[in-house]
Amino acid sequence: MILLVSPKDVAEAYEAIEGGADIIDVKNPPEGSLGANFPWVIKEIREATPEGRLVSAAIGDVPYKPGTVTLAALGATVSGADYIKVGLYGTRSYQEAVDVMKNVTKAVKYVGEDKIVVAAGYADAYRIGGVDPLVIPKVARDAGCDVAMLDTAVKDGKTLFDHMSIELLKEFVEETHKYGMKCALAGSIKIEEIPMLKEIGCDIVGVRGAACTKGDRNEGRIQKDLVKEIVKVCKE
């Protein structure tokens, strides 16, 4: 299973790289679950990341404003991100979600066909009025995305597993694979929960808090030793 670790600056990115993370995912935690960082931070982290190691960028917990979101996606792409992650926070229906993601895919693939577009929904969508998480694979498929992902919108200590059973997560993974896409799961995931994700066939696991001091995504800092421990579990 591939490990995605989400640094907020270059110093944390070096820790994630030295710890062995497969994907370096540029994020800005104060702006939310998939908070967007600045273009220059993405660029700096891309330059600091060894060739062959992929860089991802979250572009925000986005509203239903396809034009705005598409411009943000384009900005992340030209700043050097290989993966473009879109948090479908303000889309209230399947159609709105597809509308956003289809336009994002068009913009990103215009820059590079090899760029990877991630449609991210939320396991706790019921708390924010978002799209049902089990609809996300269809959204990703119909918008031409490469990856369907789930995270948690509200960071209050509850994990992915507090909002969805392992059976529902397995259903999400299987449907994503049926459509020929990769599946990514995140959401305050603890190191001891990772084997369950491996068991259901998850392709990519995303973490920040688990790789930070005190397990704190906001106040903590990513440490390479913690990343190494997570890598070991992912690769076992």
From Swiss-Prot:
A Pfam family annotated for this chain is: 4HFCP_synth
Q: Name one GO biological process term.
A: methanofuran biosynthetic process
Molecular function GO terms recorded: carbon-carbon lyase activity
Keyword terms, alphabetized: Lyase, Schiff base
Q: Can you tell which superkingdom this protein's organism belongs to?
A: Archaea
Its annotated function is as follows: Catalyzes the formation of 4-(hydroxymethyl)-2-furancarboxaldehyde phosphate (4-HFC-P) from two molecules of glyceraldehyde-3-P (GA-3-P).
- What's the family? Belongs to the MfnB family.
Q: What is this protein called?
A: (5-formylfuran-3-yl)methyl phosphate synthase
